[in-house]
């Protein structure tokens, strides 16, 4: 797909990976609508991007949003949504575990209602994460959700052809989700990535490059693209 003059919607487009994706799409000449829940973050968007507020768990709001935006060529969701239940499964609060799946429900809502406006040559990209296939102790909830997202994409790809759908799976990425600052932040990432083949945290723009690849390459669908610094092999 030649991205120039194509119309794109990016959920989670005001921060981290989503924001970097918006920036790269704009640079490539796309018309971009960035979706988020915090209007105050609209000022972070690059010139040319439009902000719209929406919660991916609100199905009626999503239907209205897609109807308002009209026909699109590119649909990206990097919205995290929900909580992240952490800890041993045998001790886990099951309400917290279930709440972690809000990310999955958000993604499925976005795809379900976005498909109605997506062109036949269009592309969808969702963001999962390495815990889907590399689950450390205490990551059962995150792994379950990520695995479900990737399985969802493989199944849906068969149903929506010639439209395409893929997942991009980041490793540990330096995003605003981590509240640490300065030396503490550097030490945090250094400790967690020490055994990676590329021993550092990734940058949001590096993940966005993977998303752009999945959009541009018309021969890729129903798969997961890893952007993880070799974490899966470590």
Predicted regions and their residues:
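Conserved NAD(P)H cofactor-binding loop of Rossmann-fold oxidoreductase domains
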Residues: 78-86, 229-230
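Catalytic loop of short-chain dehydrogenase/reductase
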Residues: 88-109, 123-161, 172-173, 193
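Rossmann-fold cofactor-recognition segment
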Residues: 46-60
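N-terminal Rossmann NAD(P)H-binding glycine-rich loop of SDR-like oxidoreductase domains
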Residues: 14, 22-23
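A glycine/serine/threonine-rich, flexible loop-to-helix segment
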Residues: 173-195
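Conserved glycine-rich cofactor-binding loop
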Residues: 7, 14-15
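C-terminal substrate-recognition "lid" of short-chain dehydrogenase/reductases
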Residues: 203-227, 232
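Conserved Rossmann-fold SDR core element
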Residues: 150, 159-175, 220-227
């Amino acid at each position: 797909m030649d991205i120039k003059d194509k119309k794109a919607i990016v959920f989670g487009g005001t921060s981290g990976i989503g924001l970097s994706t918006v920036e790269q799409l704009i640079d490539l000449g796309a018309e971009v609508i960035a979706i988020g829940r915090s209007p105050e973050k609209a000022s972070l968007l690059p010139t040319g991007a439009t902000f719209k507020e929406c919660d991916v768990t609100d199905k009626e709001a999503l239907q209205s949003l897609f109807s308002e935006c009209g026909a699109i060529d590119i649909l990206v969701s990097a919205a995290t949504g929900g909580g992240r239940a952490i800890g041993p499964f045998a001790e886990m609060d099951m309400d917290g575990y279930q709440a972690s799946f809000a990310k999955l429900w958000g993604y499925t809502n976005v795809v379900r209602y976005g498909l109605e406006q997506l062109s036949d040559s269009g592309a969808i990209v969702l963001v999962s994460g390495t815990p889907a296939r590399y689950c450390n102790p205490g990551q059962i909830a995150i792994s379950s959700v990520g695995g479900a997202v990737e399985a969802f994409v493989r199944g849906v790809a068969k149903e929506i052809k010639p439209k395409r759908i893929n997942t991009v799976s980041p490793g540990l990425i330096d995003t605003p989700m981590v509240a640490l600052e300065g030396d503490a932040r550097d030490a945090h990432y250094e400790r967690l990535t020490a055994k990676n083949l590329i021993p550092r945290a990734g940058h949001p723009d590096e993940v966005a490059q993977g998303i752009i690849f999945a959009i541009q390459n018309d021969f890729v669908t129903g798969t997961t693209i890893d952007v993880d610094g070799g974490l899966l092999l470590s």
